[in-house]
Amino acid sequence: MLMMLMMIIGITGGSGAGKTTLTQNIKEIFGEDVSVICQDNYYKDRSHYTPEERANLIWDHPDAFDNDLLISDIKRLKNNEIVQAPVFDFVLGNRSKTEIETIYPSKVILVEGILVFENQELRDLMDIRIFVDTDADERILRRMVRDVQEQGDSVDCIMSRYLSMVKPMHEKFIEPTRKYADIIVHGNYRQNVVTNILSQKIKNHLENALESDETYYMVNSK
């Protein structure tokens, strides 16, 4: 076991903004020093709903997420506990009954999702908050490609859902959370430049925290 300082970084933005790509880029730089926890896996259990009812749920609303469990799992990571996180099956529209994701305490915990800044208790756990700001047209195109490839949705279904649910929820709940961001990254960023800047900021934050004698956490090696 090693004595390490743990840093929690929130990454948010609209659906299709590029949050996952940025998260993966940061993880590639820090390797095993980074663990990722995705808000998408913390949609509430909907096993009591029929498939038809689940298809009509609004997924981009704060009430769709089990933030109590997400907050609890992040706190457990901070306490050097290994977390068994749920895995959400987007094809079935429900949590997987056969899969879980093991998340280990690390120097850097990336918390990624569309509404990770909306909940104050969740937001206050973060040392750095990053908002990925991408043009709406580009976001819907990215989402369309993803949902066709990964979920088998039709273009008509995607557009209908976007106009009736995704767009209104983005404007009401997601866009306003940019005011909580420490850093705003534009979605058409040059990956190498932005990722290197962010990685240096993360390193600086950890170094400054060490110098200021902030709290240390015992972090299990993976």
UniProtKB/Swiss-Prot annotation:
Gene3D superfamilies: P-loop containing nucleotide triphosphate hydrolases
UniProt key word Cytoplasm: yes
GO BP field: CTP salvage; UMP salvage
Enzyme class: transferase
Reactions catalysed, as given in the entry: uridine + ATP = UMP + ADP + H(+); cytidine + ATP = CMP + ADP + H(+)
SUPFAM superfamilies in the cross-refs: P-loop containing nucleoside triphosphate hydrolases
Pathway it works in: Pyrimidine metabolism; CTP biosynthesis via salvage pathway; CTP from cytidine: step 1/3; Pyrimidine metabolism; UMP biosynthesis via salvage pathway; UMP from uridine: step 1/1
Pfam families: PRK (PF00485)
Compartments it resides in: Cytoplasm
Main location class: cytoplasm
Family of this protein: Belongs to the uridine kinase family.
Protein name in UniProt: Uridine kinase
Species name: Chlamydia pneumoniae
